[in-house]
């Protein structure tokens, strides 16, 4: 009987020891996981920003939670080795993959960003852009930050593919940044996604000082003439024409631009309201959850806690600032060739970055500070939606050279 009790006690102790060794706490102690602890703290900080201060909460909350899950020892939800070298290792995928590995395929294969662009297109009104085609130039000028930062990042020692992924932050377009980075430099996906969405949330903080610095009070008081009405036929033809032109000139931009214009055509044609509402709401919400979780899962301690992340954050805000400045400065140049009520208020140039509609909403109060009777919101929406197309085209250009 004594032997039976001893045997039972040993079994219980061994079971408890096995259980203790399988816990995440044991993993932290055994591996001295200070990196994981720091990343868990970063995840909680981002959750705080999303919940308390509403910084891009729809995506920042899910990104932060994905970051939390991937850094919990022993969870085995995401495995970086399955995607090492920028490729999916299908030979070992099924045997080792966790939940987030399967969901990450939507990022790796470029599915989620394109589906989000369908939803964005269905929520976008291109009327102000059609009514004032000059807005296309302001949207293009705001992509200046992308290419200047690409050059700067390359000069600092990043590879061309990494530099391109960092530069795209300047477009202030989260899905485009994720789409391009997943192809060119997937190891940087976590830091770049966090930077892109953080700076989008900080548009009202970053842009106004630059706008005021580059404009005079007289320029900020410029009143623009009312936009002409845009017919339904124009709104239907616009996505079709843009899709054909961009797909022929820059095929690498066709997935993003094509999905954007598909969503917009659903909205404007008026015959598929059910589909339009679905992509604006249900589809968009589901994809945002999957995208945020899987992008956050890539932010492991090894990928995030290094000096390169600091460079990415600094270069990202520089790219965003230069994009803002590019739009404002081109508007000032265009005014040299404009007369009377054809002049452009340079404040709307800053809306050329594709943070829709935050950038356009920043132009409005800045204009009213100079003249309370000035209303710039609809004028600013033209460059703003042009910036969405512009950032997708910029990504296509980088892909065609670096992909």
Model regions: which residues?
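Hydrophobic transmembrane alpha-helices of secondary-active transporters
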Residues: 46, 104-130, 263-266, 284-306
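Alpha-helical transmembrane segments
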Residues: 187-205, 313-323, 346-351
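N-terminal alpha-helical transmembrane segments of multi-pass membrane transport
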Residues: 1-84
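Alpha-helical membrane segments and immediately flanking helix-loop junctions
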Residues: 108-109, 117-123, 138-148, 152, ...
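Transmembrane helical segments that form the transport core of multi-pass membrane transport proteins
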Residues: 243-331
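Interfacial helix-loop-helix linkers and transmembrane-helix boundary segments
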Residues: 51-60, 78-79, 102-103, 123-138, ...
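Entry/N-cap segments of selected transmembrane alpha helices
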Residues: 33, 129-150, 302-328, 380-384
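Membrane-embedded hairpin module used as a gating/binding unit in multi-pass transport
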Residues: 198-271
């Amino acid at each position: 009987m004594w032997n039976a009790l001893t045997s039972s006690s040993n079994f219980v102790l061994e079971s408890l020891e096995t259980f203790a060794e399988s816990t995440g706490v044991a993993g932290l102690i055994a591996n001295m996981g200070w990196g994981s602890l720091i990343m868990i703290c970063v995840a909680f900080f981002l959750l705080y920003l999303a919940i308390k201060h509403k910084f891009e909460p729809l995506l920042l909350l899910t990104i932060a939670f994905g970051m939390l899950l991937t850094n919990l020892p022993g969870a085995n939800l995401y495995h970086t080795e399955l995607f090492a070298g920028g490729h999916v290792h299908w030979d070992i995928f099924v045997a080792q993959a966790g939940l987030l590995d399967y969901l990450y395929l939507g990022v790796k294969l470029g599915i989620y960003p394109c589906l989000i662009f369908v939803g964005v297109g269905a929520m976008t009104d291109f009327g102000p852009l059609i009514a004032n085609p000059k807005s296309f130039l302001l949207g293009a000028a705001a992509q200046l930050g992308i290419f200047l930062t690409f050059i700067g990042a390359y000069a600092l020692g990043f590879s061309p593919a990494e530099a391109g992924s960092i530069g795209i932050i300047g477009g202030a377009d989260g899905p485009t940044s994720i789409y391009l980075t997943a192809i060119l430099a997937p190891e940087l996906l976590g830091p770049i996604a966090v930077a892109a969405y953080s700076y989008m949330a900080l548009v009202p903080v970053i842009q106004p000082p630059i706008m005021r610095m580059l404009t005079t009070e007289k320029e900020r008081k410029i009143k623009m003439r009312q936009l002409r009405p845009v017919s339904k036929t124009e709104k239907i033809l616009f996505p079709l024409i843009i899709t054909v032109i961009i797909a022929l000139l820059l095929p690498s931009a066709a997935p993003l631009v094509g999905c954007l214009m598909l969503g917009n055509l659903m909205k404007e044609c008026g015959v598929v309201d059910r589909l339009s509402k679905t992509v604006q709401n249900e589809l968009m919400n589901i994809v945002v959850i999957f995208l945020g979780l899987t992008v956050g899962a890539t932010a492991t301690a090894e990928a995030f806690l290094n000096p390169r992340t600091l460079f990415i954050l600094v270069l990202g805000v520089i790219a965003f600032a230069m994009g803002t400045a590019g739009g404002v400065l081109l508007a000032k140049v265009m005014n040299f060739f404009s007369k009377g009520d054809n002049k452009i208020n340079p404040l709307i140039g800053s809306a050329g970055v594709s943070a829709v509609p935050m950038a356009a909403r920043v132009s409005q109060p800045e204009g009213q500070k100079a003249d309370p009777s000035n209303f710039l919101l609809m004028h600013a929406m033209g460059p703003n939606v042009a910036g969405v197309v512009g950032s997708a085209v910029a990504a296509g250009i980088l892909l065609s050279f670096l992909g």
